[in-house]
Amino acid sequence: MKREVAAQIEVAVTAPTTLEFQVAIASPLGAQLTESLAFTVNGKSIEPREMTGPHGTRIHKFDAGEGTVTASYAATIIGRADPAPVREIDLSTYLRPSRYAEADKFYGFAATEFGQYADSETLLEKVSSWVGTRLNYVPGSSDPIDGAADTLLAGSGVCRDYAHLVIALLRAVNVPARLVSVYAPGCSPMDFHAVAEAYVHGHWRVLDATCLAPRQSMVRISTGRDAADTAFLDNHKGAVTLKNMTVTAIVDGDLPGDSIHELVSLG
């Protein structure tokens, strides 16, 4: 499989700050990667510092004064990355409640709704289907500080809201779950996409309750407890405004078929 992804971002900085971008794909061990990444501040090229986070996540950090910052990324991936490794520390970390996936608010509800499927592969289908039918995908309907409980009460949201609710419900029935930011060929509207990843029977499996794109062709960018760990841009100290952003993701040939009944791992 050959996949091509790209992102173009323009940010206005109105007070000096430190920026952290997470737009480069995670190190795809086992796949062939060709990529380019460039940043400018007021038209001048700047070399970022690359920090490596968990699960191959790459964060590019630099200081920026007032003016215009641009980020340009493009990558071609040939083949599939190796399955995500399983570490004991991850199985502990991704069971805990977090800022946007507050599993402790769902213990009783999730046990009643899904307890009979706990620790089974059927659970993944049941939770994903339940969230997908309970929520309406409405761009702009949620607030950036909304968590899973807010989303359930509102009954609507975008991809990160769907993923947070899936994650919270899974953690509430003792299944480790985490959020993954991905490039998603076929996604409409095209954007950075957020999905859930759950650990069952020795494997990390990807869930997308929005069903907006086939999971088989998704490309991992960053992985964490929730959106607090995976945002494509973090701003520290100053003030910024997102002016323009274009994301593209395509696969060579036809998009793969997908079914909520399938067990799929990112690769």
Where are these regions (language model features)?
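Hydrophobic/aromatic-rich core segments of domains that either
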Residues: 129, 161-241
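Short, charged, solvent-exposed linker or helix-capping segments at domain edges/interfaces
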Residues: 21, 83-89, 208
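Secondary-structure boundary elements
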Residues: 13, 71, 81, 85, ...
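Generic structural "secondary-structure junction" signal
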Residues: 21, 64, 79, 116, ...
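Residue-level signal for pocket-adjacent positions within structured domains
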Residues: 57, 90, 147, 202, ...
